[in-house]
């Protein structure tokens, strides 16, 4: 047994040294410096060293002996300090070991690979000590970043995996969905930089089920000493739930880094396909180690992963994804075989051998090696392949869940976050701008982009076509369009957010008076100024919550501009009666089209188009419907107007209207469930009704409906609309009715628990409310305020809203007779004064528009 253990230790040390040498060989000078010095910087704590902070910070790595590079560094620090450093304390030190893991040292490592470092510490560190050690590691991350090296430290309690404790979704160590699988990756890829050897490697695969008992027997026999080994525990049997959760996590990661994640995603799929007889890859590597079979180019973790996935895909006869995973592997290795190398290293030799086995041509290698110059056609093809592969993995995962009757043990919140991000990234929806370049190519910019409009009645579908060519007949005819959409805004947004359209792109447009180059360039400038391309990824909290509009652009009259008919005409209008939604004598709506462009809290980009006289109302209802009542207001709301005439007035009016409606939508509460907003469009008045759960639009045909709508939001009574000859009004009301004005009559009820109200419009049509409950004073104030602010809400030339304030009366009993007296309200006198002031400030002359 002793000789067997010693042989294993020698193999372990040899493979570890091979991995250290390979890691350093693939690094530039800055990476080599950081990688070599991290152990000594965690072992020592000194003001002259990076990572220093005041306090009793845990430091010191068990069994650590500095190598030559580290000794030279210590000598340099002592020379600068002027005195020798204090020797390390004896006994068990706080840090049990420092290990790199992941792609470092494997064939998958390239010169830009980041470093994932596990700092394993003693279980006896208290919370404050762990926090101090975390702060030290954070300072070391900043020190490395100052040299252009990305390092991520992970503090690992030596008992962490025994207690099934995992991190949260916000961290790189995933979430509750991973536990054993995280340990699997560590065991198969760890490189010991300092500290204790990993005990798990010493336990034969056949003893894995009895891991703890076997370890105790080794200690009891004296062949191993407990304080010389890091023991994170055995790889117990994985549950179906854990496979499910971990696979979802890999899909989550694949969205932002597809080539990197495809291989791991398929490894997990292979695990689940073999379930319940799965053998983790780390176990397979350990089996080779114990047998003395140093296969797969020195038990390289990435090569072993490719081999395992290859066997699985061949077994299920999936040649499509096999070809994809080989391309992903090739690109991950970063060795361009079609080009002459400066030197030949082991990675190039291995990759050449694999490519020869795959039968790849030189042309295929040249295409892959030119990835940095891929443009939209090639990138979209690659994106679609990656998407198909991800979705196939997802479908297989769902089948796995059904087959095993899963009750997913992963945190419901984690699962919700994962599925939300998959939905946001992958689901194709009308109006959604699909982002096709998740780290596939660094630059998709085009020198020329041409937008061509095809009207209805032609051979091609009506709408807009996008070409990455200058608009010559030969170029257009001989090329397929990059993208098609019925609406220009969607195409421009797609080109911009996917990086094709930049400040250096030459824009061309061909359309029959819908849009010209000037207007198109204005749109591009507006979008680029208000929508940054790079944003932080949505937080798990945002993904777990309902999506909310964050940045909203309202694009007015891009494709249809009613003001173009004013060209070379004299248009008479009065500023006092100027309403861009019911303009002039014809009460024409000057908004012909509205496009919405918005980005939500899940970082989705969406577009919508509305045209015709009702575009304003439809757009408003849609915007407000996407804002749940408890949502945060958008961070920005911008109106881009491209009208030929009255551009500023139209933009300002829409900005005011949208801002007011958003405020009404987000401020409606259970205590005040109904709010009302009237908008006059093309001579018709419409009401927007703001309820807690929705916003509805209703046409208001006459004054009774209008004022009834207002009062219905303030009074809780039964409303009945009738004609005058269908009801017997109180004689005093009938005799008081006056055409041409709106009249409100309040009448007390016999039980004195409420009141009735009669509303007469200009034509003396009646609406009656019985047994109303509420404040008459509040009703009078709100109705009068709606009317007095009519310049903001209506055209002054409304067919039924005239410039006389509505009249309010109280039906009373005086001297035994029923009489009508004016309703006394301080509100009315103040509103009358405000109106008089408004009138005085308005220009009275007519204006002409040329």
Curated annotation (Swiss-Prot):
Keyword presence, rRNA-binding: no
Regulation of this protein's activity per its record: The regulatory domain is involved in the regulation of cyclase activity by the carbon source.
CC per GO annotation: cytoplasm
Location(s), subcellular: Cytoplasm
InterPro entries: Adenylate_cyclase_1, Adenylate_cyclase_1_CS, Adenylate_cyclase_1_N
Record region (Regulatory): 541-850
Enzyme Commission designation: 4.6.1.1
Main location: cytoplasm
A GO term, aspect molecular function: adenylate cyclase activity
Class in the EC hierarchy, top level: lyase
Chain residue ranges for the region called Catalytic: 1-535
UniProt-listed NCBIfam families: PRK09450.1-2, PRK09450.1-4
PANTHER family according to UniProt: ADENYLATE CYCLASE
Family: Belongs to the adenylyl cyclase class-1 family.
Name of the protein: Adenylate cyclase
């Amino acid at each position: 047994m002793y000789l067997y253990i010693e042989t294993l230790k020698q193999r372990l040390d040899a493979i570890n040294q091979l991995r250290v040498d390979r890691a350093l060989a693939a690094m530039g000078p800055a990476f080599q410096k950081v990688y070599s010095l991290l152990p000594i910087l965690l072992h020592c704590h000194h003001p002259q060293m990076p990572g220093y902070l005041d306090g009793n910070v845990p430091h010191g790595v068990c069994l650590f002996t500095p190598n030559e590079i580290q000794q030279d560094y210590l000598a340099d620090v002592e020379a600068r300090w002027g005195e020798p450093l204090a020797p390390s304390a004896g006994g068990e030190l706080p840090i049990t070991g420092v290990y790199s893991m992941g792609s470092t040292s494997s064939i998958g490592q390239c010169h830009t690979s980041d470093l994932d470092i596990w700092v394993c510490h003693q279980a006896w560190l208290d919370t404050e000590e762990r926090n101090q050690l975390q702060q030290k590691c954070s300072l070391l991350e900043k020190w490395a970043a100052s040299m252009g090296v990305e390092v991520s430290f992970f503090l690992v309690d030596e008992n962490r995996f025994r207690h099934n404790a995992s991190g949260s979704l916000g961290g790189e160590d995933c979430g509750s969905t991973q536990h054993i699988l995280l340990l699997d990756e560590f065991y198969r890829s760890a490189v010991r930089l300092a500290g204790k050897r990993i005990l798990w490697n010493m336990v034969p695969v056949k003893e894995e089920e009895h891991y703890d008992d076997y370890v105790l027997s080794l200690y009891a026999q004296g062949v191993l000493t407990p304080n010389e080994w890091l023991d994170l525990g055995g790889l117990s049997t994985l549950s179906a739930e854990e496979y499910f959760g971990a696979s979802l996590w890999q899909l989550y990661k694949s969205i932002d880094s597809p080539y990197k994640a495809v291989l791991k995603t398929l490894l997990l799929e292979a695990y689940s396909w073999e379930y319940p007889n799965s053998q983790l890859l780390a176990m397979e590597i350990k089996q080779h180690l114990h047998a003395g079979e140093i296969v797969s180019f020195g038990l390289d973790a990435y090569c072993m992963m490719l081999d395992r996935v290859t066997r699985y895909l061949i077994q299920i006869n999936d040649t499509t994804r096999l070809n994809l995973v080989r391309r992903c592997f090739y690109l991950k290795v970063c060795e361009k075989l079609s080009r002459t190398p400066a030197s030949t290293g082991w990675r190039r030799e291995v990759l050449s051998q694999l490519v020869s086995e795959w039968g790849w041509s030189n042309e295929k290698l040249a295409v892959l090696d030119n990835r940095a110059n891929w443009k939209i056609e090639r990138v979209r093809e690659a994106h679609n392949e990656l998407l198909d592969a991800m979705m196939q993995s997802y479908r297989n995962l769902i089948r796995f869940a059904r087959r095993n009757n899963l009750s997913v043990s992963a945190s419901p919140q984690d699962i919700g976050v994962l599925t939300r991000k998959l939905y946001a990234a992958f689901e194709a929806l009308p109006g959604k701008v699909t982002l096709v370049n998740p780290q596939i190519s660094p630059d998709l910019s085009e020198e020329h982009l041409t937008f061509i409009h095809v009207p209805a009645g032609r051979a091609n579908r009506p709408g807009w076509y996008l070409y990455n060519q200058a608009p010559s007949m030969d170029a257009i005819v001989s090329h397929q369009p990059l993208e098609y959409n019925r609406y220009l805004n969607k195409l421009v947004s797609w080109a911009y957010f996917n990086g094709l359209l930049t400040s250096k792109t030459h824009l061309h447009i061909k359309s029959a008076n819908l849009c010209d180059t000037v207007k198109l360039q204005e749109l591009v400038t507006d979008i680029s100024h208000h929508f940054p391309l790079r944003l932080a990824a949505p937080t798990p909290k945002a993904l777990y919550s309902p999506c909310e509009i964050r940045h909203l652009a309202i694009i007015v009259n891009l494709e249809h501009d009613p003001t173009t008919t004013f060209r070379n005409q004299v248009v008479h209008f009065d500023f006092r009666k100027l309403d861009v939604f019911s303009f002039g004598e014809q009460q024409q709506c000057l908004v012909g089209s509205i496009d919405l462009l918005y980005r939500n809290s899940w970082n989705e980009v969406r577009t919508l188009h509305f045209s015709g006289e009702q575009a304003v109302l439809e757009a408003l209802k849609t915007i407000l419907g996407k804002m749940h009542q408890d949502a945060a207001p958008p961070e920005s709301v911008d109106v881009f107007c491209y009208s030929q005439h009255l551009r500023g007035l139209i933009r300002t009016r829409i900005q005011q209207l949208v801002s007011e409606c958003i405020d009404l939508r987000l401020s409606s509460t259970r205590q005040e469930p109904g709010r009302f907003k009237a908008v006059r469009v093309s001579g018709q008045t419409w009401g927007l009704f703001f309820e807690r759960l929705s916003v509805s639009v209703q046409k208001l045909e006459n004054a009774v409906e209008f004022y009834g709508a207002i009062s219905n939001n303030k009074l809780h009574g039964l409303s009945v609309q009738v004609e005058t000859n269908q009801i017997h009004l109180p004689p005093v009301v009938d005799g008081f009715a006056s055409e041409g004005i709106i009249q409100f009559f309040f009448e007390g009820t016999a039980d004195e628990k409420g009141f009735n109200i009669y509303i007469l419009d200009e034509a003396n049509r009646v609406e009656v409310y019985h047994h109303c409950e509420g404040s008459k004073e509040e009703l009078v104030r709100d109705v009068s305020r709606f009317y007095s602010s009519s310049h903001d809400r209506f055209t002054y030339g409304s067919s039924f809203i005239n410039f006389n304030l509505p009249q309010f009366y109280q039906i009373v009993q005086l001297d035994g007779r029923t009489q009508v007296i004016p309703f006394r309200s301080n509100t009315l006198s103040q509103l009358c004064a405000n109106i008089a002031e408004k009138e005085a400030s308005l220009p009275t002359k007519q204006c002409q528009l040329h």
